[in-house]
Every structure is written in structure tokens, then in C-alpha cells.
């Protein structure tokens, strides 16, 4: 019997990463319907991940994974935070706005945060959160990734997320870490649920 797992996102970058990270788990991983949208009304990444997972599960009748993630910059009090995707109209505008906000700032510490919720219709089964610390550069570097990847430097690698190959990024990223937490204790095609 095939077991379907719906990814509650239409963000193509997240979708591709989640598909790669969940490959080989025994689940048939599918995107949410093309018109799927959830208003992100949560005040935390975890709340938004939960909203997305529950909405996708209700809509499709299948187990669903909701991901909410973003960048929290120390000198900006954690901004853009849950508003990371809405910090501008596109990646270039978001990066420009963030770099302008950090002009003259010595403290450029930041962290990418990823919250993931697994839900079936009517209830959340498991929730995890992970992060990756780094530094915001003064200018973009690298051609890979998406979002804020070109300005997020991982100090121990001396590379931005945009300079990492897929395997390296998945090993070090907030999303890779969160998916590994989600899958911990799982066997093929099953999840160990919290509730």
C-alpha cells in the first residue's frame, strides 16, 4: 500500500529541499494542490507550521508536513523572523532590505530557524524545530539556494548557504536538521508520533 505524505507548501525552494530530504523514507511525497494557501497568522514558526500541516491534511485527507522557517537577526531583535518571506516582494528585495537594515551594525549574528509539524486530519502528530547559526555578510556570495542563502555565512565552513552543494547544505541547514529530528525513531513509511 502506498502511503502519501503531502508537503504543505507552494514555495518551490522548500518543496525541492523537503522532497530530497524525505526521499527513501517509504512515503510517496506529493506537493499540496496548486491553489493551496494558508494565511500565516501565527506569531511563531511552530504555530505557522502547525496551521499549514493541519490545513493540508484537512484538504487532502492525507498526512501532511507543514514547514515554516525564516531568518532571525540578532541586531534586529529577531527580525525578519516569521515575516521573512514577506520582508520584500522577491529574494533580491528581501536581501537588499535586510542589508540596509544592518548598515553600520557590527553584530551580524543570525540564525535560520525551521519548525516542522506533521498532521493528519484533525490533529498534529509531531512537531520539531531546529536552527543553524551564522553571520550575515555585507554582500551576497554564491549562486545556489534561495531566499537569504547568499548572505548567510556558516562560519565553520566559511561558505554561504548559496555556496554549498546540496549535500553540504542539507547536512548543515536548519531544514535538514529539522527533517532529521522528524524522522528520528522512524522506520520506513512510518513516523513515531508525539501524541
From Swiss-Prot:
Keywords, alphabetical: Hydrolase, Magnesium, Metal-binding, Nucleotide metabolism, Nucleotide-binding
InterPro entries assigned: dITP/XTP_pyrophosphatase, ITPase-like_fam, RdgB/HAM1
A Pfam family annotated for this UniProt entry: Ham1p_like
Gene3D superfamilies: 3.90.950.10
Catalyzed chemical reaction(s): XTP + H2O = XMP + diphosphate + H(+); dITP + H2O = dIMP + diphosphate + H(+); ITP + H2O = IMP + diphosphate + H(+)
Positions that bind substrate: 9-14, 69, 146-149, 169, 174-175
Residue positions binding Mg(2+): 39, 68
Main EC class the enzyme belongs to: hydrolase
Essential cofactor(s): Mg(2+)
GO cellular component, one term: cytoplasm
Residues annotated as signal peptide: none
SUPFAM superfamilies attached to this UniProt entry: ITPase-like
Any one biological process term the GO annotation gives: nucleoside triphosphate catabolic process
Cofactor note: Binds 1 Mg(2+) ion per subunit.
EC number: 3.6.1.66
GO molecular function, one term: metal ion binding
Catalytic residues as annotated in Swiss-Prot or TrEMBL: 68 (proton acceptor)
Protein's job: Pyrophosphatase that catalyzes the hydrolysis of nucleoside triphosphates to their monophosphate derivatives, with a high preference for the non-canonical purine nucleotides XTP (xanthosine triphosphate), dITP (deoxyinosine triphosphate) and ITP. Seems to function as a house-cleaning enzyme that removes non-canonical purine nucleotides from the nucleotide pool, thus preventing their incorporation into DNA/RNA and avoiding chromosomal lesions.
Family stated for the protein in its record: Belongs to the HAM1 NTPase family.
Assembly behavior: Homodimer.
Protein name according to UniProt: dITP/XTP pyrophosphatase
Organism annotation: Gloeobacter violaceus (strain ATCC 29082 / PCC 7421)
Amino acid at each position: 500500500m502506498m502511503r502519501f505524505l503531502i508537503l504543505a507548501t507552494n514555495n518551490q525552494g522548500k518543496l525541492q529541499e523537503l522532497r530530497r530530504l524525505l526521499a527513501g523514507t517509504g512515503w510517496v511525497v506529493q506537493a499540496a494542490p496548486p491553489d493551496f494557501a494558508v494565511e500565516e497568522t501565527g506569531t511563531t514558526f511552530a504555530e505557522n507550521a502547525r496551521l499549514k500541516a493541519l490545513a493540508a491534511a484537512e484538504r487532502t485527507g492525507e498526512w501532511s508536513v507543514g514547514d515554516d522557517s525564516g531568518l532571525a537577526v540578532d541586531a534586529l531583535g529577531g527580525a525578519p523572523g516569521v515575516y521573512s518571506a514577506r520582508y520584500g516582494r522577491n529574494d533580491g528585495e528581501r536581501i537588499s532590505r535586510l542589508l540596509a537594515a544592518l548598515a553600520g551594525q557590527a553584530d551580524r549574528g543570525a540564525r535560520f530557524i525551521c519548525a516542522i509539524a506533521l498532521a493528519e486530519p484533525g490533529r498534529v502528530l509531531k512537531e520539531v524545530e531546529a536552527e543553524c547559526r551564522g553571520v550575515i555578510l555585507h554582500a551576497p556570495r554564491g549562486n545556489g539556494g534561495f531566499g537569504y542563502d547568499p548572505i548567510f555565512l556558516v562560519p565553520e565552513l566559511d561558505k554561504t548557504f548559496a555556496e554549498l552543494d546540496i549535500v553540504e547544505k542539507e547536512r548543515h541547514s536548519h531544514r535538514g536538521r529539522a527533517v532529521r529530528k522528524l524522522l528520528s525513531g522512524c522506520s520506513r513509511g512510518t513516523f513515531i508520533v508525539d501524541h
